[in-house]
C-alpha cells in the first residue's frame, strides 16, 4: 500500500513503498527432460536485447543475471527457475532538509523580506491610482492572481498537511531530523540520462510508416526474443506476465513491471493508442506546460495550450471517465484547464486536489508563503459528461462523487517531475476493474497503460539495485 494514512484532509503516501511492492523480479525459466519419451530443452527468457546498431538490425539475446534458483524433479523431468529481484534506490527519496537553491547565503539574508511579500502586495494594490507613488516592487497580473489564489487555499494546505504530518510522525513513517542524521544524507549522484528517449521518438517519425494492419499490440511473452527498436516506437508493448522483463534500448537497460503496457512516441504518433480498441475509465495527464524555466533549462520540450487541447481525449475516454490533470502553479494554466480545456473535451470539473511536498521529517520542501516556489501542486479532476443513455446504465455500478479540496502529502523523489502514484487514491472513484491510462508518463505501473516520449525514463536500470541473497 502506498497510502500510509488516510484522514479527512486527504492521504499521506509512501511513493518508494509503492514502487518496491511492484515485484521487480526477473525470471529465467529453464526446463530439461520434461518428457520421458521425448526429451527437450528450452529456455524462457524475461530479458530482451534490442540491437543498438540499427532499428532494422537483428535482435541479440541477453540473459538476466542469475540470483535465486528453484529446482524440482519428478517423473517428467526437471525444471529450474532463476530469479533476481530489484528495488528502487531509496536514497532518491532521501529528502532530509528543505530544498536549498544556489547562493544560499544571499537567499537566507533575503528570506525575511521575501516572506512579507504576500501581505505587502495587498497594501501595494490598495494605493489609490491617482496618488503617484513609486513602487519598489511591481507585480504583474499573473503574480497578483497567484497570490490571491494562494491566500484562498493557504489555510487548507497548512491545516490539512499538519494533521497528516502529525499522524506520520506518531506512526514513525516520518521522523524528526535529529533522530536519523548520518553521513548518508549528503549529495546524491544521479544517473546520467544516457538514452534520450525523446530523440528516439523524433527519429522514429522519419522511418517508413507501418500500415494500420501492422500496428498491432506486441506482447512480450516468455519465449519472445524477436523485438527490434522500430517496434518500440510504433506499437503498444505489453508485459502480461507476473514477472518483470528487461529490455535494452540503444545500449540502455530498462525494467518493465509485470502487467504493464506502454507506447513510446510523441504527440504526433498516438495512432496505435487509438487503434488498440480500448477506452479508459481513468486518464491521468501530466502535460509539459510552457514556462520560462523550461525554456531556459532546455530540459524537455513543452506544448502550447492549444496543442494540449487537440489531444484525442474524447476518443480515449469511456463513459464517466475520470480525468486528472496536473497543473503548475501558474493561474493562466489553471484557468485554461477549468474554463477551456475540459469544456472542449466535454469534461465537467468536479474537484481540485493538491500535492503537498514534504521532507522526511515533515517540513515543507519550500516555505509555504515563498513568492518563488510553492511546496504544492494542483490537480484538476473532472468527469466526462455522461455518454450512455439513462436506460442503458448499469444500476449495480455506483461510483461515489469525487470529494473536493483533498491533499496528497508525500516525500517527493529527487528526480525531476517524478509524480506520486495515484492508483490507490483514485480507486474508489473508478468503476471496479476499470482501464487506466497515464499520458506524458515517465514510468510504468502495473495495470496501467502508459504513453509518452519519455515513458521509460524512470524505468532505467540505474535507478534500481539488485537485492543481495537473503534480502
From Swiss-Prot:
It comes from Mus musculus. Keywords: Chromatin regulator, Methyltransferase, Nucleus, S-adenosyl-L-methionine, Transferase. N(6)-adenine-specific methyltransferase that can methylate both RNAs and DNA. Acts as a N(6)-adenine-specific RNA methyltransferase by catalyzing formation of N6,2'-O-dimethyladenosine (m6A(m)) on internal positions of U2 small nuclear RNA (snRNA): methylates the 6th position of adenine residues with a pre-deposited 2'-O-methylation. Internal m6A(m) methylation of snRNAs regulates RNA splicing. Also able to act as a N(6)-adenine-specific DNA methyltransferase by mediating methylation of DNA on the 6th position of adenine (N(6)-methyladenosine). Its EC number is 2.1.1.72, 2.1.1.-. InterPro entries: DNA_methylase_N6_adenine_CS, MT-A70-like. This is N(6)-adenine-specific methyltransferase METTL4. GO terms for biological process: methylation; negative regulation of gene expression, epigenetic; regulation of mitochondrial DNA replication; regulation of mitochondrial transcription; regulation of RNA splicing; snRNA (adenine-N6)-methylation. GO terms for molecular function: nucleic acid binding; RNA methyltransferase activity; site-specific DNA-methyltransferase (adenine-specific) activity; U2 snRNA 2'-O-methyladenosine m6 methyltransferase activity. It is found in: Nucleus. PROSITE patterns: MT_A70, N6_MTASE. Pfam families: MT-A70 (PF05063). Coiled coil: none annotated. Disruption phenotype: Embryonic sublethality and craniofacial dysmorphism. Surviving mice display anatomical defects, including anophthalmia and craniofacial dysmorphism. Adult mice are moribund and exhibited splenomegaly with anemia and severe leukopenia, indicative of aberrant hematopoiesis. It catalyses: a 2'-O-methyladenosine in U2 snRNA + S-adenosyl-L-methionine = an N(6)-methyl-2'-O-methyladenosine in U2 snRNA + S-adenosyl-L-homocysteine + H(+); a 2'-deoxyadenosine in DNA + S-adenosyl-L-methionine = an N(6)-methyl-2'-deoxyadenosine in DNA + S-adenosyl-L-homocysteine + H(+). One of its GO terms (cellular component) is mitochondrial matrix. The gene is Mettl4. Belongs to the MT-A70-like family.
